[in-house]
Structures are given as C-alpha cells and as structure tokens.
Amino acid sequence: MDYSALCKEILNMDSKIRFAGVCDETGDVKYGGQREGVPNLLTQEETKKSMMQALGRWGLRNSLAPKIGKGKYAMAEYEKIKRITFPLDQEHLLLVTTEVDADHTKIINNILNKAE
C-alpha cells in the first residue's frame, strides 16, 4: 500500500481533517502530516510521544485479538480535537486528527474502505 498516497487521499476527504500520518514501530511519522495552513497543537517531539503511546495501546489491544478479533480503529475525543488511530499492518499505524465538530463516523468509514 502507498502510505503517502493514502495520507493525501485522507486529507482531501474532508476539510475538518487536520492531520493524517503513518508512523512506524519507533513512533516516527514516515508518511503524511499536517494539513497546510492548520497550526500544529503538538511539537514534533510531542507527536512522536503520542504515537508511541498509541502503539503501546494497540499492542495491548492485539493481545486480546485471538479472543475478540483484530481492532479496526480507536477514537478519543479531546476538547480541541478528535484523534483516530488505525492499525495498517504489524509495523505501521495511521493517526488521523480532526476538528471536534467533524463527522467522525463518516471519516472512519471512508478510511476503513480506503485502507482495506
């Protein structure tokens, strides 16, 4: 899968999407990034820390996969953003952030259809 193209497609999906990035198992964002003209709320270092935390949570979720199936996505809503993570493969995680008023159900469904 072309992760750069996927991130571009995601950013073009909805103007309420702030960030679409793919990180590797080290937490480094390898593809994608912030929507042009939208200010970052986190520094690059904080983004990496956030990615590492997300990777850790997905590791915990995957430990239950044999019993309940693989996770498709996880979402958290904060005061300033919504944050959605999608496991892409064993080594890559997709992080998408949106504005709080974004239609996250529509965005999640569109991303799941593209990432399959």
Please report, for each region that a protein language model flagged, where it lies by residue.
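Non-catalytic interaction/Regulatory regions outside core domains
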Residues: 1-116
